[in-house]
């Protein structure tokens, strides 16, 4: 499956949920989901009954799009979560939340996950004292993420940090705004992830 390059707002409408793919725009009245709260397409406003499989598939698609992953990547995370001790669905969400690009977004250095991914790839961050350019790196408890000094005047990053108060920072993370430093205090558990996700539906889908 190729990476989606169409309008981001169509994805939010398709999943009937704000995926925050457009950064600050998603918090304004310009959000497409607020203006047209129905799926895109000619028959978007029509009602249709969805099967159990359809409900499970939509949940998987929603989470994939939320974190910006392709099917092969997402399945790899699921298989890894399934091999871990504990509840598979909760393990899956914890792995996704601990991706470096997601942590950069959660700390407020970027207004969207796609922007965070680009910043990581361009080498704007240091993880535990070493330059990190791989968005999928797993952040562990005790890890520190520091914005490189030469990047601290980037307008987009400053604007994102100023706006982070709007969505808040998860309890498992800590931000020192003055030092441009983030800390992973612990590994995220289900209670730390406020995004409305029914992960059990994904487990049921992949268990067929």
From Swiss-Prot:
PANTHER family: 30S 40S RIBOSOMAL PROTEIN, SMALL RIBOSOMAL SUBUNIT PROTEIN US4M. GO terms for biological process: ribosomal small subunit biogenesis; translation. Pfam families: Ribosomal_S4, S4. Part of the 30S ribosomal subunit. Contacts protein S5. The interaction surface between S4 and S5 is involved in control of translational fidelity. Keywords: Ribonucleoprotein, Ribosomal protein, RNA-binding, rRNA-binding. One of the primary rRNA binding proteins, it binds directly to 16S rRNA where it nucleates assembly of the body of the 30S subunit. With S5 and S12 plays an important role in translational accuracy. Coiled coil: none annotated. GO terms for cellular component: small ribosomal subunit. Belongs to the universal ribosomal protein uS4 family. One of its GO terms (molecular function) is structural constituent of ribosome. The lineage of its organism: Bacteria, Pseudomonadati, Thermodesulfobacteriota, Desulfuromonadia, Geobacterales. This is Small ribosomal subunit protein uS4. It comes from the Bacteria. Residues 98-159 form the S4 RNA-binding domain.
């Amino acid at each position: 499956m190729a990476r989606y390059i169409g309008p981001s707002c169509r994805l939010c409408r398709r999943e009937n949920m704000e995926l925050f793919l457009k950064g600050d725009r998603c918090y304004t009245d310009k959000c497409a989901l607020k203006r047209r709260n129905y799926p895109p397409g000619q028959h978007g406003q029509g009602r249709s009954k969805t099967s159990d499989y359809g409900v499970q598939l939509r949940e998987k698609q929603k989470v994939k799009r939320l974190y910006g992953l392709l099917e092969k990547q997402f399945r790899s995370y699921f298989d890894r979560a399934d091999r871990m001790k504990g509840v598979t669905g909760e393990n899956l969400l914890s792995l996704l939340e601990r991706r470096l690009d997601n942590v950069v977004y959660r700390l407020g250095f970027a207004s969207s996950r796609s922007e965070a991914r680009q910043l990581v790839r361009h080498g704007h961050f240091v993880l535990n004292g070493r330059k990190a350019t791989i968005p999928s790196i797993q952040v562990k408890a005790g890890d520190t993420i520091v914005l490189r000094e030469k990047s601290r005047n980037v307008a987009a990053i400053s604007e994102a940090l100023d706006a982070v108060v709007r969505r808040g920072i998860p309890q498992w993370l800590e931000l020192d705004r003055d030092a441009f430093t983030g800390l992973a205090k612990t590994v995220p558990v289900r209670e730390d992830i406020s995004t409305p996700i029914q992960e059990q539906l994904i487990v049921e889908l992949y268990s067929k």
